[in-house]
Amino acid sequence: MTTLTLNTSLLSSCRILAAFSGGLDSTVLLHQLVLWRERHPDVTLRAIHIHHGLSPHADSWVRHCETVCERWQVPLVVERMTLADNGLGIEAHAREARYRAFAQTLLPGEVLATAQHLDDQCETFLLALKRGSGPAGLSAMGERSPFAGTLLLRPLLRETRKTLEQWAVRHGLCWIEDESNQDDAYDRNFLRLRALPLLQRRWPHFPAAVARSATLCAEQERLLDELLASDLTDCITAEGTLRLSPLMLMSDVRRAAILRRWLAMRNAPMPSRDALERIWQEVALARDDASPCLRFGDHEIRRYQSQLWWIKSVAGQHETTVVWPVWQTPLALPAGLGTVQLVPGGELRRPREEESVSIRFKAPGVLHIVGRNGGRKLKKIWQEQGIPPWRRDTTPLLFYGETLIAAAGVFVTREGAAEDKEGVSLVWHA
C-alpha cells in the first residue's frame, strides 16, 4: 500500500474529519490523509478523538493523539463522554455514542473518514451471518455511505490489517494498544483473535472472498431497491406513514421487503424476521377497534387510519402544566417535546396584562373553535381533525388564565381569536 485509495471523485468537498482513536488503523488513516493534504493543498483536515472513559489509560491516549496531531499540524477535537447502560451492551452503546459525537462535530461541507479495513469488513460480515441477516445486513460496509447529511468514507476498506501494520512500521508511526482489544469475550475480538486466524491459515484469501460476497449482497440489495421503488412510493404518505391497503395485496416476501425499506427511511434499526412478523400480526392486523403499539427501544410502531406510524415514545402529559412567565420568549416543553413561541402576525389575540400564560395538554368542558358551528369536547375535536391518539395528550394547548386559546397547529378557539391586526401565532418546534 503506497497511496490512499481515496480519490477526489469520492469527496463531496475538500474538507475531511478523520476519526482518530490513536490505534494502528486510525493512525495509518490519518498519516495517509496528511500525505493526501500535502499533494492537494486545497484540502482541509481535522481529527476527532472520542474519550469514552472506559479505560484507565483514556487520558494518556488523549495526550498521545494531541502529540501526533500537533506534529502533523492537524486540528484535533476531543469529545469526552460518560456511557450509561442502555441495554444495548457496551460495544453497541459505545459505537452509538461515538457516531453521535461524529455527527455533532461535522462542519458544513465536511465528510467523515474512518479507518475500517478488509479484516474489519470480514468480521462485520461474519457477525451479520451469526445474526441471520439477509442481503442488507450481509452487505457489510461500503467505501462510501450517507451519514449525518454528508458522507462517511472508508478509504482503507480494501487493505488488510497486515498491510496497514507494514505501512506503519515502514514509516516509523507510533500507535496505542487498547487492552480491551485482547478480550475475546467481545464477539468482534473473538473473531479477530481466534476465528479469523484459523480460517486464514486454511484459506489465505478468506477475507477478500468475504468482501466479494458482501459486495454481491450489496448489489442485490440495490437491485431490490430499484425494483421496489414504485411500490414504496405508492405505499408511503406525505407524512412518511405506510399505507396498509397496498400491503394487503402483496406476497409475504414483497411486503416484508417494503416494511424493511420504510423502516430504513425512518432511520429505524433493521428489524429481524421475527420483528417484521410481529409488526404485521400484532399491529397491522390488530382488531379494527384496537390501538396497537409495538415498542422498539425509544420508538414505537402504531396503527392509525389504516397506516403504520414510526414515532418516538413520549409519555402522556395530560396532567402537566408549564407556566410561561415571559410569553415573548420561547418556552421549552417537557419530555423532549421541543419548544413553543408566540410570534407576531397571526390569528391569536395577545394575552391581556392580567392574564397568566401557560401550556397544558388537556382541556375540560365544551369548546368552540373558529370555523365550526356549535361546541364540542376536545376528544371530539381531535377525532374530527384526524389527530392520532398518541398526539392528543402531547400537543401543546395554549391557555390565557383558565381559557383555552389554541392547540398548536390544529385549531384556535373563539375566545382566542384576534380582534385586530396585532395578532400572534403559536409556533411549535417539535
UniProtKB/Swiss-Prot annotation:
Intracellular or extracellular location(s): Cytoplasm
Record key words, sorted: ATP-binding, Cytoplasm, Ligase, Nucleotide-binding, tRNA processing
Sites where the protein binds ATP: S21, G22, G23, L24, D25, S26
Entry domain remark: The N-terminal region contains the highly conserved SGGXDS motif, predicted to be a P-loop motif involved in ATP binding.
InterPro entries: Lysidine-tRNA-synth_C (IPR012796), Rossmann-like_a/b/a_fold (IPR014729), TilS/TtcA_N (IPR011063), tRNA_Ile_lys_synt (IPR012094), tRNA_Ile_lys_synt_N (IPR012795), tRNA_Ile_lys_synt_subst-bd (IPR015262)
Molecular function in Gene Ontology: ATP binding; tRNA(Ile)-lysidine synthase activity
Record organism: Salmonella paratyphi A (strain ATCC 9150 / SARB42)
Top-level EC class: ligase
Main location: cytoplasm
EC number in record: 6.3.4.19
One GO process term, biological-process aspect: tRNA modification
Stored Pfam families: ATP_bind_3 (PF01171), TilS (PF09179), TilS_C (PF11734)
Biological role: Ligates lysine onto the cytidine present at position 34 of the AUA codon-specific tRNA(Ile) that contains the anticodon CAU, in an ATP-dependent manner. Cytidine is converted to lysidine, thus changing the amino acid specificity of the tRNA from methionine to isoleucine.
Similarity annotation: Belongs to the tRNA(Ile)-lysidine synthase family.
HAMAP family in the record: tRNA_Ile_lys_synt
GO CC field: cytoplasm
Name assigned to this protein: tRNA(Ile)-lysidine synthase
Catalytic reaction(s) noted: cytidine(34) in tRNA(Ile2) + L-lysine + ATP = lysidine(34) in tRNA(Ile2) + AMP + diphosphate + H(+)
